[in-house]
Design a protein with these regions (language model features):
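Sec-dependent signal peptide recognition
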Residues: 1-9
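Sec/Tat signal peptide C-region and signal peptidase I cleavage site
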Residues: 14-20
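N-terminal lobe/hinge region of extracytoplasmic solute-binding protein
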Residues: 20-110, 117, 140, 147
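Alpha-helical secondary-structure segments
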Residues: 56, 131-138
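Glycine-/small-residue-rich active-site loops that bind phosphorylated ligands and cofactors
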Residues: 93, 123-124
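A structural micro-motif recognizing beta-strand termini
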Residues: 116-122
Length: 147
């Protein structure tokens, strides 16, 4: 009988902990994300806009690094347009992040941790898949080294 009770308590604890985990395409600091997981474009973008062609930007100033994350020096303006991140924000709501390389985001109610589940089609410029090890390496590089 004691074993049955212990198993029952274990199942209840596991069920409770699973119920408290949020899994979503986006995470909002307050309330819920504006856009659901099937949105095709944000409200402030014209989905019928002309696509393709060439765009040229000019910038006044100089740079001494291609690393946009460094605290030392000045990075190239617009360098962030060359890569994707785990999440991205929208310009019409504050404090919400939508999965970009991340297909889903998981977090507990107390927000003590966060997990990102990568899209299967997330690729580097050379066609190789982005792996969890790549994300971990990037995080550790930013967190543990002086850029």
């Amino acid at each position: 009988m004691l074993i049955v009770r212990l198993v029952f308590i274990f199942i209840l604890l596991c069920t409770q902990s699973l119920a408290e985990i949020n899994i979503s395409h986006a995470i909002a600091m307050h309330g819920h994300p504006k856009y659901d997981n099937n949105f095709k474009n944000v409200d402030y973008v014209n989905p019928k806009a002309t696509k393709g062609g060439k765009v040229v930007f000019s910038v006044i100033g100089s740079y001494d690094t291609f690393n946009p994350f460094t605290l030392k020096g000045d990075s190239v303006a617009g360098i962030g347009n060359l890569f994707e991140t785990l999440t991205t924000s929208s310009s019409d709501e504050a404090f919400t992040e939508y999965g970009l390389l991340a297909e889903t985001i998981e977090w507990p109610e107390d927000r003590s941790w966060v997990a990102f589940n990568l899209r299967k089609d997330a690729k580097w410029h050379d066609g190789k898949s982005v792996t969890p090890e790549d994300v971990i390496w990037t995080f550790n590089t930013f967190y543990w080294t002086e850029l």
